[in-house]
Amino acid sequence: MAIFLIDLPPSDMERRLGDALTVYVDAMRYPRGTETLRAPMWLEHIRRRGWQAVAAVEVTAAEQAEAADTTALPSAAELSNAPMLGVAYGYPGAPGQWWQQQVVLGLQRSGFPRLAIARLMTSYFELTELHILPRAQGRGLGEALARRLLAGRDEDNVLLSTPETNGEDNRAWRLYRRLGFTDIIRGYHFAGDPRAFAILGRTLPL
């Protein structure tokens, strides 16, 4: 088997939404049925201006094929239908988005100056989701997907939110630190969610 990174245009994400949500639920260890609850929000995100997604897929490879034998490479159709190991997507932040409103509120409560908030929030890409199936973790796929997704973005910054964890001791936190993300807000509680989150960010390009 071989792993390939692919871009997911909106039509492919809509067609493979069930597969992408399965990756999400398994990676986050959420109960079955969460897919149905999250699907409407993911579909709404797909329709946002500048939305972009990438995936890691697994295909059968002819290991003995000559390196120059391009016939051994999977076709675009094979790649677009191959089993999904990971998925990531995001879109530019904009006024009126719930996440932006929540983060701006958190920045204000944390005492950030108005101009600093404006500089940060005027031009950023929200890394909304990044998930790898548990069986495929530890292979560098998370970093590869993040780099592919963020390559060529023209925003000034990239921001994300991730659940707080003791000592930042999980794969997600290690990935974000390795990619150069720094603290924007720590211990933040989004409206309606009892968990504490960290808002992390860094400048673009990576």
Curated annotation (Swiss-Prot):
The residues forming a coiled coil are: none
The UniProt record lists the N-acetyltransferase domain at 44-205
For this UniProt record, the keywords arranged alphabetically read as follows: Acyltransferase, Antibiotic resistance, Transferase
Picking any one GO biological process from the record gives: response to antibiotic
E.C. designation(s): 2.3.1.-
Record-linked InterPro entries: Acyl_CoA_acyltransferase (IPR016181), GCN5-like_dom (IPR013653), GNAT_dom (IPR000182)
Which domain of life does the UniProt lineage start with?
Bacteria
Catalytic residues in the record: 176 (proton donor)
Reaction catalysed?
Answer: L-lysyl-[protein] + acetyl-CoA = N(6)-acetyl-L-lysyl-[protein] + CoA + H(+); propanoyl-CoA + L-lysyl-[protein] = N(6)-propanoyl-L-lysyl-[protein] + CoA + H(+); succinyl-CoA + L-lysyl-[protein] = N(6)-succinyl-L-lysyl-[protein] + CoA + H(+)
Please tell me which top-level EC class this enzyme sits in.
Answer: transferase
Q: What is the effect of changing residue 16 to A?
A: Unable to inactivate INH
Q: What happens when the gene is disrupted?
A: Inactivation of the gene does not lead to general growth defects, and the deletion mutant grows to levels comparable to wild-type strain on all carbon sources including stearic acid. Mutations in this gene restore the growth delay in a icl1 deletion mutant.
Under the heading Pfam families, the entry gives: FR47
List the GO molecular function terms.
acyltransferase activity, transferring groups other than amino-acyl groups
Q: What is the effect of changing residue 129 to A?
A: Unable to inactivate INH
Is Acyltransferase among this UniProt entry's keywords?
yes
UniProt similarity note: Belongs to the acetyltransferase family.
The function of this protein is:
Acetyltransferase involved in the post-translational regulation of the central metabolic enzyme isocitrate dehydrogenase 1 (ICDH-1) through lysine acetylation. Can also use propionyl-CoA and succinyl-CoA as donors. Cannot act on the isocitrate dehydrogenase 2 (ICDH-2). Might play a role in regulating the TCA cycle and methylcitrate cycle when M.tuberculosis utilizes fatty acid as carbon source.
* Protein name as it appears in the record: GCN5-like protein acetyltransferase Rv2170
- Protein's organism: Mycobacterium tuberculosis (strain ATCC 25618 / H37Rv)
